[in-house]
Amino acid sequence: MAILINKKTQVICQGFTGLQGTFHSEQAIAYGTNMVGGVTPGKGGHTHLDLPVYNTVHEAKAKTGANASVIYVPPGFAADSILEAIDAEIEVVVCITEGIPVLDMVKVKRALVGSKTRLIGPNCPGVITPGECKIGIMPGHIHKRGTIGIVSRSGTLTYEAVAQTTAVGLGQSTCIGIGGDPVNGTNFVDCIEMFLKDDETKAIIMIGEIGGNAEEDAAEFIKQSKIKKPIVSFIAGITAPPGKRMGHAGAIIVGRTGSAEDKLEALQSAGVIITRSPADIGKTMLDLLNKG
């Protein structure tokens, strides 16, 4: 039944009438996502893209029954937008915004504890259940309904894995970009746990990168999990020099932690199949499933 979102998910957009909110809402509607409205403070009572605009998330939820929100708000205001969605008890919140100050996200992280909200991102491409619901900036046409769950810190590498699994005929159950910032709402462990429990997901692709210990935590979880499914992983940044940030804010090797080799070793010890080239992700998964 996929995870997080499906054709019944009712989505609102925060930052609805802005340039990015408008463009990507149009794309989501064209894909078939059940967009029910949007939020732009001061523009409540108007319509945009033939959908109602509200001043607050609380009002939007009360009027539309929305249970998911996507946020296209500038970095300085994005954390407040997330907090507003948490306060309104929106179940799934996807924040696309890059560059949110770390201390702002620490406040958000604290607010998430004990809340009813699952935050995806920030600095992420979003979530898609192919053929049902697209929340985010990913190109919808490369996705195909299928059985592979994909979770990634990198947006463009997510698209690479999607295109390859589509090309070899496997397709995807749900694809999640968790984002490349050091403080995010949902991590690898959260997503892998959901995929392992999902009957529709037969195998998992996990795309990590240097920096932090999210991949090592995932390896330990996989090792301890009683539910087993085939998992293929690619880690970006094998040639990255220590101390140099590589694209994402969280992609930096500090001291003795966060290197690609450490992550690869941890994942291999958990039984994860490693591919060292992003061009081989789909083929590696297909070969693994054919062997099984």
Swiss-Prot record:
EC top class named in words: ligase
Molecular-function GO terms, alphabetical: nucleotide binding; succinate-CoA ligase (ADP-forming) activity; succinate-CoA ligase (GDP-forming) activity
GO terms, biological process: tricarboxylic acid cycle
Catalytic activity: succinate + ATP + CoA = succinyl-CoA + ADP + phosphate; GTP + succinate + CoA = succinyl-CoA + GDP + phosphate
Keywords: Ligase, Nucleotide-binding, Tricarboxylic acid cycle
Pfam family, one: CoA_binding
Keyword Flavoprotein attached: no
Residues bound to CoA: T17, G18, L19, Q20, K43, I96, T97, E98
Active site, renumbered: H248 (tele-phosphohistidine intermediate)
Family, as annotated: Belongs to the succinate/malate CoA ligase alpha subunit family.
Function according to Swiss-Prot or TrEMBL: Succinyl-CoA synthetase functions in the citric acid cycle (TCA), coupling the hydrolysis of succinyl-CoA to the synthesis of either ATP or GTP and thus represents the only step of substrate-level phosphorylation in the TCA. The alpha subunit of the enzyme binds the substrates coenzyme A and phosphate, while succinate binding and nucleotide specificity is provided by the beta subunit.
Description of how the protein assembles with itself and partners: Heterotetramer of two alpha and two beta subunits.
Designated name of the protein: Succinate--CoA ligase [ADP-forming] subunit alpha
Originating species: Rickettsia conorii (strain ATCC VR-613 / Malish 7)
Gene: sucD
